[in-house]
């Protein structure tokens, strides 16, 4: 259980932490589009985590999970080959392992839909589905996202 809590906590920090100051201002084109989309996903995920951590307003998790699921099918389209110009955090491994990347993006959609359909009155089931969404995010970010450099904010 401690491992699960640690994994969820680390993922929450990974997803909810804001980008370095000015990161989006230098992004253009598809890189900017995907950074903005990922920022929206992080916003919805933060809302979900706050509700689960507080064990309140759990029925409203559905809308945030549906929003994440709606973004997920667009992930692969926002990573055309060669779109690595800074401030992109995309690794070349995405295009070297394209089928795996697509599967991981699809897993986010699948797990987000399961979370949206989870019974808000069954906290254990809801938490389990939230962990599955966390694992979908981590699986992709660990392999395909460069680590952020610590910058002054």
Question: What is the role of each PLM region?
Answer:
Residues 133-144:
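The canonical Cys-X-X-Cys-His
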Residues 1-2:
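N-terminal secretory signal peptides that target proteins for export/translocation
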Residues 16-18, 78:
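Selective for proline/serine-rich intrinsically disordered segments
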Residues 17, 23-24:
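Boundary of Sec targeting at the N-terminus
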Residues 17, 112-113, 137-138:
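A short hydrophobic/aromatic micro-motif that marks alpha-helical segments and, especially, helix-coil
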Residues 148-149:
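Short Cys/His-rich "knuckle" micro-motifs
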Residues 5-16:
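Bacterial N-terminal signal peptides
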Residues 24-134, 152-153:
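Extracytoplasmic c-type cytochrome modules immediately beyond a signal peptide or single-pass transmembrane anchor
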């Amino acid at each position: 259980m401690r491992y699960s809590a640690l994994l969820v906590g680390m993922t929450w920090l990974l997803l909810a932490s804001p980008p370095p100051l000015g990161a989006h201002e230098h992004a253009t084109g598809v890189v900017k589009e995907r950074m903005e989309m990922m920022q929206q996903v992080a916003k919805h995920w933060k809302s979900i985590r706050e509700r689960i951590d507080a064990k309140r307003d759990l029925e409203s998790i559905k809308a945030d999970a549906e929003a994440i699921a709606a973004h997920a099918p667009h992930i692969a389209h926002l990573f055309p080959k060669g779109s690595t110009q800074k401030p992109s955090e995309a690794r070349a491994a995405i295009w070297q392992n394209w089928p795996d990347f697509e599967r991981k993006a699809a897993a986010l959609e699948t797990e987000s839909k399961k979370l949206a359909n989870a019974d808000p009155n069954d906290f254990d089931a809801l938490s389990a589905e939230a962990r599955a969404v966390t694992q979908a995010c981590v699986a992709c970010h660990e392999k395909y996202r460069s680590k952020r450099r610590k910058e002054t904010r």
